[in-house]
Amino acid sequence: MKKNFWEGYVAPGRVFGNLYFVGTRPASTHVLATEEGLIVIDPGYPEALDTVLENMRAVGLDPMQTRIILCSHGHYDHAGAVLPLKELTGAKTYVGKGDFDMVAKGIRTWAEELGTEYHEAFTPDVLLEDGDHVTLGGADILCLSTPGHTAGTLSFFFDVSDGEKTYRAGMHGGVGLNTLNKKYMKDNGIPEEMRERFLAGIERLKGERVEIFLGNHVPNNDTAGKLAKVAAGDKDAFIRPEEWIPFLESRASALRDLIAKEEREAETVRIIAEEKIVMIVRGVPAEQMIPLAEAMYRGGVRVMECTYDATGKTPDTEIAATIGRLAKHFEGRMLIGAGTVIRPDQVDLTASVGGRFIVSPDTSTAVIKRTKALGLASLPGALTPSEATTAHRAGADFVKLFPISNMGASYLKAIRAPLSHIKFLAVGGVRLENMADYLAVGAAGFGIGVTDADKKALAEGNYAAIEEKCRAYVSLAKGNA
């Protein structure tokens, strides 16, 4: 379990007029006060319900006057506290129709990703559909279906008043992209069209007049900062009609960026799989890297790994600068990545200069996860079935079986028997004489290092020798020998 994921205090307060914020930093909860009772929007985590109740009392609201509990969507951080709040107050519960299985059956609630379990399943009193209205004591909340984050995500629009002025408040019910990445969608059987529905919802909501933009999460609209301004005397701090459209556009752009990142990542994985050869360059002076890479390119190499210096003699920044120069020089012709990556910050550095993949000597899940988060291909090192499985589950695209020379082709055959779904690269001691043996037992590719002989040829300007070597390896790997 992620330690106390529900904690994070935000001083409660009045948003404007009859609308209040009583939630926490991880989970926003708003309350609309009416003549006939309270409407609680997204009660949050069950673990934080006591805090929400205390916050309600702190702003002068009686939790026992809650008549309606309204959920923007069915995830644990929004609907987890519905059941205990309903049991306490007897309020009616409202959820988008598309999220019925989430709240009633505990399916895909995001509780598992937080390391906990969803025990608070409930059957909603009302299942809302697009265009429905939730009314109580003069309040009228328009509910618009905006699927994407979940199938049943609802966005809310309603008037708030201080008795003198009335403003239109609006909230998108779920803009997180954690459920719209390709892996999550594939693992959970979510159709890719959900992304298009998300974007369509964004466009639709641009047509809604919103003067008070409410955050479905605190950072969306700087809830905490605005509450502090209200507390300091600026009662109109939340009245920002200029914020709504830019926020929506930023979320649409974020999804398009995610799609582009995933497409680039998929292209990297495809090229590595097709080319089969990753040339590993270590200890070559920076000024010789481009001439060396050009010779490799002429020899048919399309994937090149530049290693960081584990001894620390050459600073990471210098090696990253070389990777950046190579990436720029060979854009569209050759993939450039980093090797001997042992820390997440090295992943960040590589990504910042245009590197396309990360090779590690070990199975560091922190490195793998950071690699995937940045849209790079992951090639960690492993030797045992347990290590290989750990790497694969963390998101590795290939697993580098290293050093393969210690084990031989028979070991690759044995490890692939139960793990045929993992793409193994044979690295360490691979020669022209034994490549066919590894290919015969299912090697997905190879890592081939630059040898002392290659460095000597480079120093002598004998690029033809380097080309010839590369051509021989590439030809054999692709079955053209």
Where in this protein do the model-derived segments appear?
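Active-site-adjacent beta->alpha loops and helix N-cap segments on the catalytic face
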Residues: 286-288, 310-328, 344-348, 358-390, ...
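Metallo-beta-lactamase
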Residues: 8-9, 14-16, 38, 45-47, 65, 97-251, ...
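Hydrophobic faces of well-ordered beta-strands that scaffold small-molecule active sites
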Residues: 277-281, 304-306, 336-339, 358-359, ...
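Conserved beta-strand hairpin/beta-sheet module of binuclear metal-dependent hydrolase folds
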Residues: 5-59, 63, 155-177
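Active-site HxH/HxHxD metal-binding segment of metal-dependent hydrolases
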Residues: 19, 47-50, 56-133, 233, ...
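C-terminal alpha-helical cap/extension of soluble enzyme domains
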Residues: 218-221, 267, 290-291, 413, ...
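Conserved N-terminal beta1-alpha1 strand-loop-helix module at the mouth
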Residues: 265-336, 341-353, 373, 433, ...
